[in-house]
A protein has these predicted regions:
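Condensing-enzyme catalytic core mediating Claisen C-C bond formation in acyl metabolism
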Residues: 1-57, 165-206, 210, 222, ...
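Structural signature of outer-membrane beta-barrel domains
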Residues: 14-16, 157-158, 235, 412
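Short, flexible, mixed-charge acidic loops at enzyme active sites
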Residues: 26, 97-105, 358-361, 419-422
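Claisen-condensing/thiolase-fold acyl-transfer catalytic domains that form or cleave C-C bonds
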Residues: 60, 64-67, 90-100, 111-112, ...
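Membrane helical hairpin/interfacial module
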Residues: 78-91
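Amphipathic alpha-helical segments in well-structured domains
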Residues: 100-104, 174, 178, 245
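Flexible, glycine-rich active-site loops centered on histidine and acidic residues
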Residues: 139-177, 299-316
């Protein structure tokens, strides 16, 4: 590890199995995209960039396999593992009440029985959000020098039957699982003053989202907040996709800004995006602790405050019966000191006004995923500029200084359009610059593995390091054209977007 780093990614483990499934299986189903466009190999690649994806066996717990592979690494001492996070959404079984991390953790329990263990629900950016959580815990002194965090990402979309059989969303997803070890370096003793003097209990028989928003508003009024963390023990997919915290965030925003809610501002995409970027600027995600107690989520919120990056955090413990406890956490005089190496900065932003863009819905006696493809595409491409500027500018970094961009592989068509929004160049220079960046600074695998949801951020650097990526062309762009140089990258930007809607990013300096 670098001598002055606070947190570094030190090892990966992977599930490398599965059956390769090409587009012919969907072509044979006789499906159509919106507008009556027939589903075939050509239209799938043109719209999504996907040629093949991996499908796991029906009897595999692929997250366990990834963790086992990680622990083969002789540099990982399981007794030093202090935090285990399951960054996932659906996992192996959409009916599983969670926490989904309990299956991998059983493989670890004897080595680290006192570890903090939890799921984290934040859509596809879940890994990045988990990295930020670990960064906060390291900055605040919750994690100490030499402590190891393990983040397990596992999405078995096909086994879980996440979408209805005739939903074209099935086409884009692939199964995957990775386990990542992060080590805390320099330990910090936080200065400043921490306050947690406002709490409120709630109990409801109505919609828990409304109940939580009203209880928070009664406690905090219209005061701004930097983040909302919910320990969500409801144990139902419809309350974790999107994260319940994202829906609570927006319900609270409507109480804070009743005039804007009344005039329908939040139903107009461009206006609501600008309003959130200017007035809200807060993250929202769920956890589900293995041994649930209100004090656990409160300890995490405290760490965010003590990191110096955030001043006002709301924590909620939501019990299985929809009762719970809300706490306000605030701090003064804590200072965020950017480390020179390792993870140097992070940022997560949630726009809960778009929570319906990706959601799990009850359908008859079952539950299935539902996506507003146009809305997701708009948010992914139009929401990046403000978010990335907020991360890069305080670090005096510009996009052209990034050596390696690890971008979520939701849909290849999103990536060039996102970069067109982000790059600050004259109009006639944008497209050539984007093509150069895609070819020489970006790693791509969506054409071979599909959208692997939360696992993308772990899979891409792992496959780069082991030489599993190949030069190719996709939708008219050269891809993976500079792999040898990217293996030597010094400044790395990880960026992901997904349900919530949430965007989460972090910077690494090696």
């Amino acid at each position: 590890m670098g001598g002055n780093s606070v947190l570094e990614i030190v090892a990966y483990g992977a599930w490398n199995g599965g059956t390769v499934v090409d587009n012919s299986i969907y072509e044979k189903k006789g499906l159509s995209f919106k507008g009556g466009v027939p589903v075939n190999n050509k239209t799938i690649e043109e719209r999504m960039g996907v040629r093949t994806r991996k499908v796991a066996g029906t009897d595999e717990r692929i997250g366990v396999t990834a963790l086992q592979d990680l622990l083969v690494n002789p540099d990982i001492d399981p007794s030093r593992i202090k935090l285990v996070v399951g960054a996932t959404n659906v996992g192996d079984d959409k009916y599983d009440p969670g926490p989904l991390i309990r299956f991998p953790y059983e493989f670890l329990r004897e080595h680290c029985p006192n570890a903090h263990v939890m799921d984290l629900y934040a859509g596809c950016p879940g890994f990045n959000v988990a990295v930020e959580l670990c960064f906060m815990l390291s900055l605040s002194g919750f994690l100490n020098t030499g402590d190891i965090t393990v983040i397990v990402g596992a999405e078995n979309i096909h086994r879980a039957q996440s979408f209805q059989p005739d939903n074209t969303a099935n086409i884009i997803f692939g199964d995957d699982a990775m386990a990542t070890a992060l080590k805390t370096g320099v330990s910090h003793s936080p200065g400043g003053q921490y306050f947690n003097d406002q709490t409120k209990n709630f109990n409801t028989t109505k919609d828990p989202v409304t109940a939580m928003a009203e209880a928070i508003y009664a406690l905090n009024g219209s005061k701004k907040f930097d983040g909302l963390i919910v320990d969500n023990q409801l144990g139902n997919l419809i309350y974790r996709v999107p994260a319940t915290a994202a829906r609570v965030q927006h319900a609270l925003v409507k109480l804070m800004y009743p005039d804007e809610a009344e005039n329908g501002l939040f139903n107009r995409f461009r206006e609501s995006l600008g309003f959130y970027d200017q007035n809200i600027r807060a993250f929202a995600f769920d956890i589900m602790t293995l041994d649930p107690k209100p004090k656990k989520v409160e300890a995490l919120a405290k760490a965010y405050v003590q990191s110096g990056k955030y001043n006002n955090i709301i924590s909620v413990f939501l019990a299985p019966d929809a009762s719970g406890t809300i706490s306000l956490h605030r701090g003064t005089d804590f200072t965020f000191k950017r480390p020179p190496t390792g993870i140097i900065d992070t940022l997560t932003s949630t726009h809960g006004c778009y929570a319906d863009y990706i959601q799990a819905l009850p359908m008859g006696d079952d539950v299935f995923g539902d996506m507003d493809g146009k809305g997701v595409f708009l948010y992914a491409t139009r929401g990046a500029k403000s978010h990335l500027n907020e991360l890069l500018s305080p670090n005096s970094i510009t996009m052209d200084q990034i050596d390696l961009l690890i971008e979520h592989q939701a849909n290849f068509a999103m990536i060039p359009l996102t970069l067109e929004q982000v790059l600050e160049l004259p109009k006639d220079e944008i497209k050539p610059a984007v093509a150069d960046l895609v070819a020489n600074k970006l790693v791509t695998n969506v054409h071979e593995r599909g959208n692997c949801s939360v696992v993308c951020m772990q899979r891409l650097p792992y496959d780069l390091k082991r030489g599993a990526l190949q030069k190719d062309r996709l939708q008219g762009f050269k891809i993976n054209a500079n792999l040898d140089q990217l293996k030597k990258a010094n400044l790395i930007l990880n960026d992901s977007v997904g349900a919530g809607m949430t965007r989460s990013s972090f910077l690494q300096k090696l």
